């Protein structure tokens, strides 16, 4: 399943990010991918050795950690260090699959259950640049407003189509979820959404408390901590 997460960054935050990224040092995006991905990857990424990168990636982590919908959908256990990429002048990233595990500065290694793209460019400012994801439900093409994020299973084949006008800038990361199984995670997300909807409509009652108890018991049964 794919989950759009709106408003991870405010318009003011996006504008500030874009202004700072104009001053960033950009390097060949192939430096952070494996042999298979390098064959189809043609973009640029912010140099992770720069002081600016360290500040911006911390801000992205803070933003997603404070976003309730992101937490409900991902149930994150470990977040990778966010990276930043840029596409322009027909740059693209062909179909590829993300690595199953990644190194992590604190945890050593993490499993990649979910991938996330945080859009930092207004969709009207560039042509092309859609994130295309193939999963069991078909093919999805995603081009969200700046400040919005999309979550999708890391096991999915995906690509970024060529940017034929303008510049597409985004941040991206991987998540190891407390719930390894996509279907179980999707069920918990749907249950959580329905509980929140019922609470807003009817307030607290015994039936909602029973559903909340069910949610937490399922989370307790399925989670890997």
UniProtKB/Swiss-Prot annotation:
Q: Name one GO biological process term.
A: DNA damage response
One term of GO molecular function: iron ion binding
Q: What EC numbers are recorded for this enzyme?
A: 1.14.11.-
**Which parts of the sequence belong to the Fe2OG dioxygenase domain?**
78-177
Q: How is the cofactor bound?
A: Binds 1 Fe(2+) ion per subunit.
Keywords tagged on the record: Dioxygenase, Iron, Metal-binding, Oxidoreductase, Vitamin C
Give the matching NCBIfam families.
Answer: PRK05467.1-1, PRK05467.1-3, PRK05467.1-4
Name of this chain's protein: PKHD-type hydroxylase YbiX
What gene is this protein translated from?
ybiX
């Amino acid at each position: 399943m794919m989950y759009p997460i709106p408003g991870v960054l405010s318009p003011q935050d996006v504008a500030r990010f874009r202004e700072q990224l104009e001053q960033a040092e950009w390097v060949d995006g192939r430096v952070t991918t494996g042999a298979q991905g390098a064959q189809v990857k043609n973009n640029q990424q912010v140099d992770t050795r720069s002081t600016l990168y360290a500040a911006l990636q911390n801000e992205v982590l803070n933003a997603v950690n404070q976003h309730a919908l992101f937490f409900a959908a991902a149930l994150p256990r470990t977040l990778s260090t966010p990276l930043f990429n840029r596409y322009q002048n027909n740059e693209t990233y062909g179909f590829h699959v993300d690595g199953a595990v990644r190194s992590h500065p604190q945890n050593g290694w993490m499993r990649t259950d979910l991938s996330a793209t945080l859009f930092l460019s207004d969709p009207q400012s560039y042509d092309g640049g859609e994130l295309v994801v193939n999963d069991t439900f078909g093919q999805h093409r995603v081009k969200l407003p700046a400040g919005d994020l999309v979550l999708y299973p890391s096991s999915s084949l995906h690509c970024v189509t060529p940017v034929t006008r303008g510049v597409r800038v985004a941040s991206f990361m991987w998540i190891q979820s407390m719930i390894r199984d996509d279907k179980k995670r999707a069920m918990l997300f749907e249950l959580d959404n329905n509980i929140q909807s019922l609470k807003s409509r009817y307030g607290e009652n015994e039936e909602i408390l029973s559903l909340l108890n069910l949610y937490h018991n399922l989370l307790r049964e399925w989670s890997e901590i």
